[in-house]
Curated annotation (Swiss-Prot):
Location of this chain's protein in the cell: Cytoplasm
Assembly and interaction partners: Monomer.
Gene Ontology terms: cellular component: cytosol
Protein name, UniProt field: Valine--tRNA ligase
NCBIfam families assigned: alt_ValS, PRK13208.1
Catalytic activity reported: tRNA(Val) + L-valine + ATP = L-valyl-tRNA(Val) + AMP + diphosphate
Function text: Catalyzes the attachment of valine to tRNA(Val). As ValRS can inadvertently accommodate and process structurally similar amino acids such as threonine, to avoid such errors, it has a 'posttransfer' editing activity that hydrolyzes mischarged Thr-tRNA(Val) in a tRNA-dependent manner.
EC number: 6.1.1.9
Keyword terms of this UniProt record: Aminoacyl-tRNA synthetase, ATP-binding, Cytoplasm, Ligase, Nucleotide-binding, Protein biosynthesis
A family per Pfam: tRNA-synt_1
Gene Ontology MF terms in the entry: aminoacyl-tRNA deacylase activity; ATP binding; valine-tRNA ligase activity
Motif 'KMSKS' region: chain residues: 578-582
Gene that produces this protein: valS
Source taxonomy: Bacteria, Bacillati, Actinomycetota, Actinomycetes, Micrococcales
Domain notes from UniProt: ValRS has two distinct active sites: one for aminoacylation and one for editing. The misactivated threonine is translocated from the active site to the editing site.
């Protein structure tokens, strides 16, 4: 092994990642598993394969890799797969923008369609659904190759023979299999119900995909008339007036008790609607009486259900007013008014409705400006609407107390890191307002394996679904034909039609334990790794990925899919805002990795405590710079020890780390050396316990503190003795270097592998994790006082603006318990270049110092 005169970090990533991959040191070998306890399995988050990874991915995936490397060194057979989430809206949008295409399911498939990147919406071309899906797969595969390159450069110890995708045939087969299982058990069902709807994407949205944003709006006070009085209501959505089906007030509100059971007439549209009591009405909100529309918000849905109101939808899937007036509008005046709204966007409809209200003097006073929370699809830019639609659902405990209690119990059975994250899971579960909506009106996704019989006119009979035989999976019902039918019966009277909706991406991602573990293809593998040891993930998807995975596992296996879960925090920009691609403040990791190296970036990630948000200023990444300095110091320290042993006659050529075990304790006799090893024992124990509890930050800090003390103090103190060939010093240096490289290996794998290679031909990442030496001799206080001595001497020279090489003729120094360091005063005097030294018991300080040549 050629050891450079000046060690460098440049090129280590390419050198070692290639060797690791070719030697397959991270591959999971099922035949090596003799018992479940031998395995440590990780349900790795599959990153969304749409564009580029950002620095937040590097942050959280490093945390997982540290644990994987630690468990491997602990003797576990680690199952560490990698998946690609290439299914869903992000991929669709990327393909639309990249190729400038739009999917039109009515178009025929075009064979051998080849498109290049265009990025020009004005040139958008319509293509068939099948062609669109092929482009999605093509671009996803290109993105996945880039992702794999970055993960390899970062040093993830992933088993690249264990990869999966969320939209390939295996994923479709698995998702369809478990969907049919859920249908058979009653866990999955179809319903026509109010649905949260994104008008931009034209798809239903689940509760877990919603975020609230503060929006500026106005309260408008409208006048409704009854036979004896005017009733005033306040609303932020006058455009929904045509869909009003009732007014509601709290049953104890004396202002409106006399109206309960009566009717009022809506302004402009002249619809007669009832006034009803309901305890969800808020007397202190607005005028205290509310307009019920179908539907303005979730409360409207509650009132509609509880009061058994009629539905009067006026918004279509594109977010425009429907073409025909709803049935309750019967007056000629009302129908004429509605005709002027037909086809308008909601913002235009609001403006025009207000104009009509003003013209008939049904607006009272001036609008009142407010800021209020409005629900959005997390990927959308327009407020969500609520439409009556047919959708597929999976029961999640919303209306089943026994299931809720079971899911809470499964959550409590997990080891949560940090523990506080359990409260988020429980809070989400107890705050559900619907079952889990799993169908989407999109193009890319797992098809529902369903057809429907048609009636005499060719209309789908949704109450008569046709399900396939399990042996026919995977399938696309828009291409495949159900058994007993022929293709010419598709869409024909008394024939069949395919379900065109696809499954929500979480309906597939919720099955990553089964998908990565090849539940259908390799039962022995799945048996060996399930339940998984760990699910690492972000805190923002507890309500989606984690919760949905527990639901699916409970239905499939009656258990939680993992034993523990580790939740990472967010990466914040310098303004303390969460970095995300959607907000445009996310930084790609390539530049910073190229500039500082993978080990430095991993160090920065490891310094953050699990679950805690961490800020990053990419222009001045202080911790990353510190990490680079640490990695270089590891190389320089190892080089120093190697050369010491090469220069010793008893060693020929390359020192062998194996020589350290079993340790010849008889060779380690110096009190300072024994004190250092005692402190090393403490470091091993603390670092090991920290990593077992997923506290990588504490483990790194503990080891790093010991290492810098070793380099800055111990090495300087024993250097002369080591150069002189002292066996105690040389053995101690070799032992400590061995162990420190191992302790740092999970954090900075490249520098530690390089340093290890100078001593041994094996990989440090296949070595056993260090165990405490359990020394019976050695006083840990000795090293502490010796370090204090050296710190005072250095400080004195620095204060006098002298070189550290300046000799001291006489030193009088006070230290607590100075007699402890008397046996090593020769080492200390040589290290500090001191001729005469007088020790005094007291608080640590220099009492007198005279600089001058040492008498020789």
């Amino acid at each position: 092994m050629n050891i450079p005169d000046k060690p460098s970090l440049e090129g280590l990533e390419e050198k070692w990642s290639k060797l690791w991959k070719s030697s397959k040191i991270y591959n999971f070998e099922l035949e090596q598993v003799s018992a479940k306890q031998d395995v440590y399995s990780i349900d790795t988050p599959p990153p969304t394969a749409s564009g580029v990874l950002h620095i937040g991915h590097v942050f959280s995936y490093t945390h997982t890799d540290i644990i994987a490397r630690f468990q491997r060194m602990q003797g576990k057979i680690v199952f560490y797969p990698m998946g690609w989430d290439d299914n869903g809206l992000p991929t669709e949008r990327r393909v639309q923008n990249y190729f400038s295409v739009r999917c039109d399911p009515s178009l025929p498939y075009c064979q051998n369609l080849k498109l290049a990147q265009i990025n020009n919406d004005s040139m958008a071309r319509s293509i068939s659904r099948r062609n669109f899906i092929e482009l999605c797969q093509q671009l996803s595969e290109e993105d996945e190759r880039k992702f794999e390159e970055l993960w390899n450069y970062l040093g993830l110890s992933v088993d690249w023979s264990q990869t999966y995708r969320t939209i390939d045939d295996d994923a479709i087969h698995l998702s369809q299999h478990f969907f049919l299982e859920n249908v058979n058990s009653g866990a999955a069902y179809q319903d026509w119900a109010p649905t949260l709807w994104d008008v931009t994407y034209r798809t239903a949205v689940a509760q877990a995909e919603i975020e609230e944003r503060q929006i500026t709006g106005f309260y408008y006070r409208l006048a409704f008339e009854n036979e004896n009085a005017t009733v005033e209501i306040e609303t932020t959505r006058p455009e929904l007036l045509a869909g009003c089906v009732a007014l509601v007030a709290h049953p104890d509100d004396n202002r409106y008790k006399h109206l309960f059971g009566s009717h009022v007439i809506t302004p402009v549209f002249d619809v007669k609607v009832p006034v009803l009591p309901h305890r969800a009405a808020q007397p202190d909100k607005g005028s205290g009486i509310a307009m019920v529309c179908t539907f303005g918000d979730i409360t409207d849905v509650q009132w509609w259900r509880d009061l058994n109101l009629q539905s009067c939808p006026i918004i279509d899937a594109s977010g425009r007013v429907v073409p025909d007036a709803p049935d309750p509008i019967v007056s000629e005046r009302g129908r004429r008014a509605f005709a002027t709204l037909s086809g308008k966007t909601l913002s235009a409809a609001k403006k025009h409705t207000l104009e009509m209200l003003i013209s008939e003097k049904s607006i009272i006073g001036e609008p009142r400006k407010i800021t209020h929370p409005v629900k959005f699809f997390e990927k959308g830019d327009k407020p969500l609407e609520i439409l009556l639609t047919r959708q597929w659902y999976i029961r999640n405990g919303y209306s089943d107390n026994a299931l809720t209690e079971r899911l809470i119990e499964l959550g409590k059975q997990l080891q949560w890191y940090p523990k506080t994250m359990l409260r988020r899971y429980e809070g989400w579960l107890t705050g559900l307002n619907s079952d889990w909506l799993i169908s989407r009106q999109r193009f890319l996704g797992v098809p529902f394996p369903i057809w429907y019989q048609t009636d005499d006119r060719g209309n789908a009979k949704f109450d008569d679904p046709i399900f396939p035989d399990r042996k026919d999976l995977p399938l696309d019902p828009t291409i495949a034909v159900p058994r007993g039918y022929s293709e010419n019966q598709r869409g024909a009277p008394n024939g069949f039609v395919a379900e065109t909706d696809v499954m929500d991406t979480w309906a597939t991602s919720s099955l990553t334990p089964q998908l990565a573990g090849k539940y259908l293809k390799n039962p022995k593998l799945f048996e060996a790794i399930f339940p998984y040891s760990l699910r690492p993930q972000g805190q923002d998807i507890i309500r989606t990925w984690l919760f949905s995975s527990i639901i699916r596992s409970e239905y499939a296996h009656a258990t939680a899919p993992w034993k523990s879960t580790a939740i990472s925090g967010f990466i914040l920009d310098p303004d303390r805002k969460k970095m995300s691609k959607s907000k445009g403040n996310a930084k790609t990791p390539k530049d910073i990795l190229d500039r500082y190296g993978a080990d430095a970036v991993r160090y920065w990630a490891a310094c953050a405590r699990l679950g805690v948000d961490t800020a990053l200023d990419v222009e001045n990444p202080t911790q990353i710079k510190i990490g680079r300095r640490l990695a270089l110091k590891v190389l320089n320290a190892a080089r120093f020890v190697v050369h010491l042993h090469k220069n010793k006659e008893t060693y020929s050529g390359q020192p062998d780390m194996k020589r350290c075990y079993p340790i010849d304790f008889a060779a380690i006799s110096n009190p300072l050396d024994l004190s250092l090893l005692k402190q090393l024992d403490q470091t091993i124990e603390q670092s090991t316990n920290a990593l077992k509890n997923f506290d990588h930050s504490k483990a790194l800090d503990t080891t790093e503190t010991f290492f810098w003390n070793f380099c800055d103090n111990y090495v300087e103190i024993v250097k002369d003795r080591a150069y002189a060939g002292d066996e105690s010093a040389l053995t101690t240096l070799l032992v400590v270097t061995n162990i420190v490289i191992k302790l740092l290996a999970p954090f900075i794998p490249y520098a530690t592998e390089e340093a290890w290679s100078w001593f041994n031909e094996t990989s440090v990442h296949t070595q056993s994790w260090p165990e405490t030496l359990k020394l019976h001799s050695g006083d840990i206080e000795l090293l502490k006082i010796a370090c204090s001595f050296m710190s005072l001497v250095r400080g004195g020279k620095t204060e006098a603006k002298l070189s550290q090489k300046t000799e001291i003729a006489y030193l009088k120094i006070a230290l607590p318990n100075p007699e402890i360091i008397m046996p090593i005063m020769d080492d200390l005097r040589r290290a500090g270049k001191i001729d005469k030294c007088e020790l005094i018991d007291g608080d640590a300080q220099i009492l007198a110092i005279e600089y001058g040549e040492i008498s020789r």
